[in-house]
Every structure is written in structure tokens, then in C-alpha cells.
Amino acid sequence: MAEPSSSAPVGRPRTNLWLESRYRKLRRGLPQTVFFCPRCKGDRRRARDCTECGGYGKLTKESVQELIARRLLPAMQAKGGRFHGAGREDIDVLMLGRGRPFVFEVVGARNPAVDLEALRAEIVARAEGAIELAPFVPVPRARVAYWKETHFDKIYRAEVALEGVPTEAALAAARAFAGNVVQRTPQRVAHRRADLDRERSLQVLGLRALPDGALEARLRCQHGTYVKEWISGDDGRTSPSLASLLGVPARCRLLDVEEILTDDAVAPADPVDAAARPVTEG
């Protein structure tokens, strides 16, 4: 594949630019942005003796941000970059469908006039199946605020492990659920989020049995819904939950974002065929 040109006069003035795209995340264990160590915060001096990250400064080798930046910034001879996503998925969650919108802010680019399509193709090729990208589109800075401040419903696919066998009546009630749920700040994020009750809307689009006795659930959720906690109930902090509707303990063993319902998006009509999905486990 031809390398995108990055040659530019050394004395050329630097400029900032904003590139909008969407990413599909096809490998689990990949965070959206740099996953700095919570103990040393990535500080080189503190990282030397850090037992949390072993001196690495980060808890993962790569992120969506880094996979893009490692090729984009050198090609544009930029001083740095910032990743602005329209929300984020958990590190163990895939981002499928048309992908998650984002704006990559390129800071101090000396060579902004690169072939964006060649650059995108090079980034995807070097990511080796971890991500896919929509074409880059130069946009005004205001698009950062738009994606940060505008909230959209999402379609999820979840695999749910059960401890027990729900009744047919309970399954019917769960399949028919569409309404509001109240979620107290989940235990897993309570150390960094205010302890509040949040009300969110959720609709079950489908619920079917899998061969191993688990369930596959397809959900439409309001922005900010803690889907894993809605499935388990989070020790009573989410009500109603799928576990309470089914009458048996439940936990989310796998979660994918199938679509973000931006104004021009259409929700998938049918469940995604897991066997046909290009997914790399990590």
C-alpha cells in the first residue's frame, strides 16, 4: 500500500484541524482513549516504581486513539492530537454497526494537506483488524461540542448468563418490557461518580434462548444507561432489572453496541449473526 505523503517545508506554519469519522471496534480489551495507570497517571518518574503498571504507565498497550494517532500525527507533522468521542463503550464491549462518531483534533499540523483516504486506509491496515474507520471529513471545531453535548439512544446486543430457569410467564414479561428504570450509581464506578439515582428509558427489542442455556437480548437504551447493571440488578441498585423480571440471577457475559441512533442512523432490523461478525477476541 502506498504511503501517504508527509513531506512539507520545515518552515511551514502550523495549524490545527478537526477530522470527523466513525470507528468500529472489533477487538475486545481495546479502550477508546489512552488507558493511563490510575496509580502513577502515566507520569514517567512515578511509573518507574509503580507496581500497578510495572513501569509502563498504561494498563493497555493500545487504544482506538493511539491506533489512529500513531500514523495520523507523523503524516501531518503535528505536535499532538486530541480524541473527542460521542460517548464511549466499555473496554470489553465491541462497537459495531456504522460505528461511533468522533472528531480527532490535530494540533499544530505542519503538513495538513495529506491524502486523507490513503491515510485512513493505512491506519486501518496497521490496526490489523482491531478497528475500521469511515472516511475522514474536515469539520469546524464546533463539531466537537455537538458530539459531546448531543445524546443518542443505542441498540445493544447482550449475552446473558442465568443461574436458574425462568418461567415462561417471566420470559414473556421480560420480552414485553419497555419503560423507565432507576439506577443508583453502579458499584463498579462508585469510586469516581457521584452517588445518585438516575432514571433512564429502556426497551427490550428481543429475547431468545441460546444453545448453552444463556439468553440473547437486544435492547434500545437511552444515553447513560448502565446496561450490565440493568441485566444483573447490581445488588438491588437498578430497578427493575432483567434479573428481577426473570426471577433468577443474571449477569452480562458479552455486550456489543450494534448501533448509535444518530439522526441519520437506522437501527438494525435483525439480530447480528455472531458467526458472521469479523471479531478478534483480546
Regions found by a protein language model. Name each.
Residues 1-282:
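Non-catalytic RNA-recognition surface used by pseudouridine synthases
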